[in-house]
Curated annotation (Swiss-Prot):
Effect of S38A: Strongly reduces the interaction with cdca3
Record-annotated Protein kinase domain positions: 213-487
EC number: 2.7.10.2
Xref: Pfam families: Pkinase (PF00069)
This protein's UniProt keywords: ATP-binding, Coiled coil, Kinase, Magnesium, Meiosis, Metal-binding, Nucleotide-binding, Nucleus, Phosphoprotein, Transferase, Tyrosine-protein kinase, Ubl conjugation
Example of a GO cellular component annotation carried by this entry: nucleus
Source organism per UniProt: Xenopus laevis
Protein name (database record): Wee1-like protein kinase 2-B
Record's catalysed reaction(s): L-tyrosyl-[protein] + ATP = O-phospho-L-tyrosyl-[protein] + ADP + H(+)
């Protein structure tokens, strides 16, 4: 690439740039002989050892206008150096070598160099980011210590795990600047974290629900919102997605929606509690990802039986009562109360077990051991020690809760469980108020059309006793002999099996000891001409034997 620089309408010097010898070509052309009559020739005749540039920016020109071909600025002939010989001041060779000619096109090598980022610069990705983090409100950005405080977390757990231990893990200096926010001082440790004010307004990102899940069908709707059966695109498994009907941010229902998330997070995983996986907010709506129960709810089973004129058998009623009481035992043991036990909040999980035709014993395809009953919908959960009661369905509400007597909150779940089993047994729908409602609160069960054993019927009456102190706790129900009879036979068989296994092990040990003794006897040399076989004697070998014959008919 060749370029001519003109000064005052005359050709001063030809420049030739190459992509591989940019600097060498520049230094070689400086020493080339200029044309006659050019200013460069006069510089050489005046014994000026280096090319001299005019005084720069004397007229206040910007750096982009100095010596620009498009500029109308021309050196003033009256501007002279010392003695009028050299117009300007001489530059050192190294400075001249680094001089950047203004408005000169870049060479391919220089353009490539300018495209490379500097070591200290940050590269901004123009494409779509796979992980997009959206900052919250200004208040949350300024104070990174704002987090949600779970009200159901035990106080002892907070004191044990939220206190700083004095050990601080330092991060390398080359980490991202955002990581520095993870370091907190003694005044900012999680024990003093404050709760966020606008929890549901911080995720304005692309819909996670549409990105991660494929909606199959709508399986229910309630006070909270709609419930959908979905498949997660990543693992291909079924999940239940609950989405609130209306925006909850800033409303009175926000804390009610968060209560279910808090309760699920504290309870963790239990075989008789619907499993919780995740929760997030989209467009001010709360979304909860839970376990999918393929058997529906107990309410669905009751409605199906009513259409067919059937009832849940007593053995299955005992199994439902036993499993739900085990779930309540776990919830109450965690310091929480459900406060909304009813058939629509008890879900059924059926294990998919394949039974061959030859192995079928004529019983139902699904045995009691292959069905799990789980407690779900924790939207009304509250703490036993610090109750903030939100009344559930009035049909299952205990009288002491209506009177705001919260001294024995877990017994309210027992009362609702007794009425739930009565409905599963075939009782008519429960009244919401008036005389029928008060009749049940006096300890009377609704009419059950199917016959039940006296022991089981007495247990159900005990569950709805008007005195909450008389009702059995969940721990006692889980061990009740009336409920354990359905599994007592299996326990007895298991005990007998263990005894037989022990006997078999003892016999095998004796057999091995006998074989070992026989092998040792065979390995010993014979003593006094006798062998081990000579020691055996046949009793009665030389004695006379009596013979008797019996002939029929004689």
């Amino acid at each position: 690439m060749r370029m001519a620089m003109s000064c005052g309408g005359r050709l001063v010097q030809r420049l030739d740039f190459s992509s591989s010898e940019e600097e060498d070509g520049l230094s070689n052309r400086i020493n080339e002989a200029p044309q006659k009559g050019s200013p460069v020739s006069s510089w050489r005749t005046n014994n000026c050892p280096f090319p001299i540039t005019p005084q720069r920016n004397e007229r206040g020109l910007s750096p982009t206008q100095e010596l620009s071909p498009s500029s109308d600025y021309s050196p003033d002939p009256s501007d002279k150096g010392v003695g009028g010989e050299c117009p300007g001041t001489p530059l050192h060779y190294s400075t001249w070598k680094k001089l950047k000619l203004c408005d000169t096109p870049y060479t391919p090598k220089s353009l490539l160099y300018k495209t490379l980022p500097s070591p200290g610069s940050r590269v901004h990705c123009r494409g779509q980011r796979l992980l997009r983090f959206v900052a919250g409100t200004g208040a949350e950005t300024e104070d990174p210590t704002l987090v949600n405080v779970n009200p159901f977390t035990p106080q002892s757990y907070r004191q044990t795990h939220f206190q700083p231990n004095g050990k601080r893990k330092e991060r390398p200096e080359d980490d991202c600047s955002s990581d520095s926010q993870m370091k907190f001082t003694d005044k900012e440790h999680p024990a003093v974290f404050q709760s966020k004010r606008f929890v549901l307004r911080e995720t304005n990102m692309e819909s996670r629900y549409k990105t991660e899940f494929l909606e199959i069908e709508k399986i229910g709707a309630g006070e909270f919102g709609s419930v959908f059966k979905c498949v997660k695109r990543l693992d291909g498994c079924f999940y239940v997605i609950k989405r609130s009907k209306k925006p909850l941010a800033g409303s009175t229902d926000e804390q009610l929606a968060l209560r279910e998330v808090y309760a699920h997070a504290v309870l963790g995983h239990h075989p008789h509690v619907v499993r919780y996986y995740s929760a997030w907010a989209e467009d001010d709506h709360m979304i909860i990802q839970n376990e999918y129960c393929n058997g529906g709810s107990l309410q669905d089973l009751i409605m199906e039986n009513n259409k067919k004129g059937q009832f849940v058998p007593e053995q299955e009623l005992k199994e439902i009562l036993l499993q739900v009481s085990m779930g309540l035992k776990y919830i109450h043991g965690s310091g929480l109360v459900h406060m909304d036990i009813k058939p629509s909040n008890i879900f059924i999980c059926r294990k998919q077990t394949e039974v061959g035709e030859d192995e079928s014993d004529g019983e139902d395809d699904v045995a009691s051991a292959s069905v799990l009953y789980k407690i779900g919908d924790l939207g009304h959960v509250t703490s036993i020690l610090n109750p903030q009661v939100e009344e559930g369905d009035s049909r299952f509400l205990a009288n002491e809760i209506l009177q705001e007597d919260y001294r024995q909150l877990p017994k309210a779940d027992i009362f609702a469980l007794g009425l739930t089993i009565a409905l599963a047994a075939g009782a008519a729908p429960l009244p919401c108020n008036e005389d029928g409602w008060h009749h049940i609160r006096k300890g009377n069960l609704p009419h059950i059309p199917q016959p039940l054993t006296p022991a089981f019927l007495a247990l159900l009456k005990l569950l709805v006793h008007p005195d909450p102190a008389t009702r059995p706790p969940a721990t006692s129900l889980a061990k009740n002999s009336v409920l354990r009879r359905c599994v007592g036979k299996a326990a007895e068989l298991q005990k007998q099996l263990n005894v037989e296994k022990f006997k078999t092990a003892m016999l095998e040990r004796e057999l091995q000891a006998a074989k070992l003794a026989q092998d040792e006897c065979l390995d010993l040399p014979p003593v006094s001409g006798f062998s081990c076989r000579g020691r055996k004697r046949l009793v009665g070998a030389k004695n006379a034997r009596s013979l008797s014959f019996t002939c029929g008919g004689y």
